[in-house]
């Protein structure tokens, strides 16, 4: 077989390319490495044909002009044809939540392949991205690389949108993950920006996510978690206001007391007295 495989040290932008390569396969060649990956690998078939299957998807014959993806954490099988073995190039993307969010809105994520994209935007995007990946790193090339990555996912979303039901399910998963993070970390003093970094989502997208699923904001939920816990501690313990403030994620008692009064209508000390503690 003739081919190349290269890893990419560039870590700029939120959507990272980890590796890329090309292969002209021998007849009936089957990949025998670890077929469950922690990345997303998009293949474009340049010549020939072969058989591709991903878990929970039927096997299908793909040919020149088609693309397929090896999704994160999904067993896949792909084999070159005996008479017309395929040649393809691939680009591997990191498995961050931002990549997953963009992919989830595309038909590629649902089917794991797209047919005959060679005359459209997707091939143009992949081809140009693959070409730029061979250029040595520099600031201007890093900027170009980032723009090409986002253009690729933009065109996947525009020209091959996913079933709306699947998009809604993915959005629900992101929301549930965000809520779980806040529930588990509010006492550590985490911020909404910490949550954004954890999920690799923008603050504006996160806000929309919470308004859609809970008609509230992330900050309001974080405040509620902290202050409901504080109310419980004020009514069941003799810990000082400062100690309770620290226990629920506030660095100082002044900020805590101000937030508590705004939330409950009374200062922590008055609230404690009102319930007889």
UniProtKB/Swiss-Prot annotation:
InterPro entries, sorted: AraC-bd, Homeodomain-like_sf, HTH-like, HTH_AraC, HTH_AraC-typ_CS, Tscrpt_reg_AraC-type_HTH
Keywords for the protein's UniProt record, in alphabetical order: Activator, DNA-binding, Transcription, Transcription regulation
Stretches assigned to the HTH araC/xylS-type domain: 176-274
Domain of life: Bacteria
Segments of the chain annotated as binding DNA: 193-214, 241-264
GO molecular function, one term: DNA-binding transcription factor activity
Presence of keyword Transcription: yes
Signal peptide: none
Protein's job: Involved in the regulation of the raffinose-operon.
Protein name: Raffinose operon transcriptional regulatory protein RafR
Gene: rafR
